[in-house]
Amino acid sequence: MFDIELDELRSWFGFGVAGNFAGHLEQAGESADFVNVASNGVAPKGIFPWYVPGDDGFLGQFPLSHDETVLPDSDTPLNLQIEPEVGLACRVHWLGDVVASLEPFALGAFNDCSIRRPNAPKISYKKNWGSASKGVAQQFFEVSDLTPDGPTATLRLNCHLHTSDGQEHEYGVDSPLLGYSYYGEVLLDWITERLDNQKGSADTPLEDVGALMVAAGHPAHVLIGIGATKYTPLGESTYLQAGDEAVVRVYSTASDEASELRQRVRSVR
């Protein structure tokens, strides 16, 4: 297993993949946001930033935590949902200002926790509200081979919610990593192409992530949330409350190894 150090992650760039698991965007009420985004068949809709080291705006806030989710400071109720994902750690190979390739070396449990904000101009507006907006497990699986018959073929992702009244609920549908629409080299090649060519526009929720990476100083590493799985009926309709515990787990069916993330939810005050 590979230890994930938060201090080290402060220099990494963070971004996510939208629409990489069939049905998730519809469950999250976000499919309409992508009406002006062209995509090919089952391909994801695009990529979005959630952490830009050195950025002067909200994306420059370091959002990752191993053990808690801090609710945004708001006078009105905000609907927050766990987004159970695989976090993929990659080395970035640059050719000038262009990302030539991404080299994966570890993966594990990641919570791309999101505020459901209707009509948000960009996906990133739902993703980073400051400290402990996002969750990452303390340990990842060490993997460089993402081929369908490789070492990740036996890995699955699940998600549970422990509510403050002591109940435990299945929040995300237990899914194989090979269930992602794009995975392995197909996903890495697609992401690299998007980093080079996705420019974003006013009529879509997407942004020029590649340009943000260049502005961040050509980071040597990235943490990529490769997409949230489908929700259970309870997960689709249940939002996080102070006192809850969110659990995201990437586990092996061939051994007892697991990358597990447990985050206690608390208010900022």
Task: Give names to the regions the model predicted.
Residues 17-19, 218-232:
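Glycine-rich beta-strand-to-loop/alpha-helix junction loops that act as flexible
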Residues 9-214, 237-238, 261-269:
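Glycine-enriched loop-and-adjacent helix/strand subsegments that border the catalytic/binding cleft
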Residues 219, 241-245:
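Loop/turn positions that initiate beta-strands
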Residues 1-10:
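Short, hydrophobic/aliphatic alpha-helical segments
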Residues 22, 228-233, 251-256:
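Short, charged beta-turn/beta-strand-edge "cap" motif at the junction between a beta-strand
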